[in-house]
Regions:
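Acidic/histidine-enriched, glycine/proline-rich intrinsically disordered or flexible terminal extensions
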Residues: 219-239
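Short catalytic/ligand-binding loop motif for oxyanion handling, primarily in non-cytosolic enzymes
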Residues: 88, 182, 224
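GST-like domain detector, emphasizing the conserved glutathione-binding G-site
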Residues: 1-161, 233
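GST-like fold's C-terminal all-alpha helical module
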Residues: 111, 118-217
Length: 239
């Protein structure tokens, strides 16, 4: 549960940052923020969550992060007592993994780590197709999504991309896959032709993962958000 459940917006005040407390700036429905939350959950790192209204962004947050995107990670440095801030989901996730030695998520082998990073970097082909479907071009988007899923089906050689248990790559890919059921009304049914059996098994394994379950937002709530998002009027807070 976020420390401030409501999404803060223009005119709000930045909650005071406490020493020895890690803060994540987030948005309840943002898949990029979910990446960081999955890493935090997988590594059992305590943190404070502050949700940001991404349409009506607080002035104080724009001073910390000019693009106004989430996630953002902030803390008070133990030695200098100055606040530190890191943006971008991949950078935040890598930092969390490198600074918390328990349950390391990145491979120790440099070549395997590079292979994983290639798949993560090329994942934009999946996210682009996903949003193409969501924003009203379902026919081309569905074709693109099915085409761009093939390399990921071929890359799976174990239960997870990381092997017998999830690694960083699994958590970085997951948020959009979790949202695939939202595309059914637009005509996309994952694995309807049976061409992605390994990815289908991976999805089942990920859904059973403790970190995934811990940060998942109920599908019905996400559907409500996406209805407003598609109309250009996203609603962030639901009673």
């Amino acid at each position: 549960m976020p420390s401030y459940p409501k999404h803060l917006k223009t005119g709000s005040e930045c909650p005071p940052l406490k020493e020895n407390q890690l803060r994540l700036y987030s948005m309840q429905f943002c898949p990029y923020a979910q990446r960081a939350k999955l890493v935090l959950a997988a590594k059992n790192i305590p943190y404070e969550e502050i949700n940001i209204d991404l349409v009506d962004k607080p002035e104080w947050y724009l001073k910390k992060n000019a693009p106004g995107q989430v996630p953002g990670l902030e803390w008070i440095d133990h030695d200098s007592k100055e606040s530190k801030f890191i943006p971008e989901s991949l950078i935040v996730s890598d930092y969390l993994d490198e600074t918390n030695s328990q349950n390391r998520l990145q491979p120790t082998d440099p070549y395997l780590k590079a292979q994983h990073r290639v798949l993560i970097d090329r994942y934009s082909s999946i996210t682009t197709a996903f949003y193409k479907i969501m924003r009203g071009d379902p026919k081309e988007g569905v074709a693109d999504l099915n085409k761009n899923l093939k390399p990921y089906e071929e890359a799976l050689t174990n239960t997870f991309f990381g092997g017998s248990k999830p690694a960083m790559i699994d958590y970085m890919l997951w948020p959009w896959i979790e949202r695939f059921p939202l595309l059914s009304e637009a005509g996309f049914e994952f694995n309807s032709d049976g061409k992605f059996p390994k990815l289908a098994a991976w999805i089942n394994a990920m859904e059973a993962n403790e970190a995934v379950q811990k940060v998942k937002v109920p599908t019905e709530t996400v559907k409500k958000f996406m209805e407003g998002y598609k109309q250009g009027k996203p609603q962030y807070d639901f009673e």
